[in-house]
Structure formats: C-alpha cells, structure tokens
Amino acid sequence: MAHKKAGGSTRNGRDSESKRLGVKRFGGEAVLAGSIIVRQRGTKFHAGINVGCGKDHTLFALADGKVKFEVKGPKNRKFISIEAE
C-alpha cells in the first residue's frame, strides 16, 4: 500500500527561447555595409539614409559610415541613418 499520494501533474514549466532583439550598433559607431544595426518586431526604428529594412524589420547598413539616431517628423519617429565617411 502506498504511503504517499501520487503527485499531480502541472501544465506550466515551458517558455519560448529569447529572440535576441534590440540595438546591435549604437550612435557614433562605425559600421560596414551589410552590418545589422537593429533587430526589432515592427518598426520601432525607421530606416533613414543609407539604411535598409529587411522583411522582419531588421535595419542594416547599405554603406560604410557612422550610425546616427535621430527623431524626425510630426509624429516624432525614430530614424537611423548612416553618415558616410
């Protein structure tokens, strides 16, 4: 005869893997063409001059230069540009 009642099962205990989103190159940093600047969900940051936007909204450098963050427009949107050297 068992001396302990059987333990119940739980439906918790799992979590999704982190997606490593965020800014990868900060303002003033030198980058090469093709370098990833930001990984994001949606357009928290918008592509400015010399910056491309991938299908998953990843921003990347189209030219060598320095990263520049700026807030522009009537809606105060955040843009990332590359100032060519």
UniProtKB/Swiss-Prot annotation:
A single GO cellular-component term from the record reads: cytosolic large ribosomal subunit
Instruction: Decide whether keyword Ribonucleoprotein is in the record.
Output: yes
Record's InterPro entries?
A: Ribosomal_bL27, Ribosomal_bL27_CS
Q: Which GO terms describe its molecular function?
A: structural constituent of ribosome
Top-level taxon of the source organism: Bacteria
Which PROSITE patterns does the annotation name? RIBOSOMAL_L27 (PS00831)
Protein family (similarity comment): Belongs to the bacterial ribosomal protein bL27 family.
Full protein name: Large ribosomal subunit protein bL27
**Which species does this protein come from?**
Yersinia pestis
